[in-house]
Amino acid sequence: MNRELVWLFNFSSSWVGGGLIRTIETVRWFDNNMGAYFILNDRIKDKISKYNNNKYFFVSDNKMKRLFSDGYYIPKIIAEIGRPDVYFSYGIPVFNDIAIINWFHISNALTLKTDNISLPLKTRIQMLILKRRIIKSIKYT
């Protein structure tokens, strides 16, 4: 891995659909170029195993742990790799100043505006929690 510019990507909530495709394409590009660090969902371990120029940290999709302590794995990763130059978070709020540049990609705009949309109560609560976390995280990005 080239250490000139250190990238840390957090795709830990992307293990299906379009998020998975974006994850694999990003993994592939960085593997063919400078290499990067990736936080990934452990469900896709077999899909990226052939890309050896990157370093991976796998986390499980534990909804209860994410509800009460989202991003719990980040301090341990930073302790291992040091402060990255760029932290890119795909759909996961940035809870503190992780890198020199913190980049947050909102993958679901529904979380920001649920008024007048018919949603099950559980989904509405999830969206409200995520909305609050996104708003709190803006100051770090």
Task: Name each region found by the language model.
Residues N2-L8:
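Extreme N-terminal starter segment of soluble prokaryotic enzymes
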Residues L8, T23, W29, N33-P93:
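Active-site donor-binding segments of glycosyltransferases and PAPS-dependent sulfotransferases
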Residues F9-I24:
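A short, glycine/small-residue-rich beta-strand->loop->alpha-helix junction that serves as a flexible
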Residues S14-V16, K63-F68, P120-M127:
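Short, flexible loop segments at the rims of nucleotide/cofactor-binding pockets, characterized by
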Residues V16-G18, K45-I48, V94-I98, T111-T114:
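Short catalytic/ligand-binding loop motif for oxyanion handling, primarily in non-cytosolic enzymes
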Residues F30-D31, F95-A99, I138-K139:
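Short, conserved loop/helix-junction motifs that constitute active-site signature segments
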Residues K76, T123-T141:
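Membrane-proximal helix-turn-helix segments that form the acceptor-binding/catalytic region
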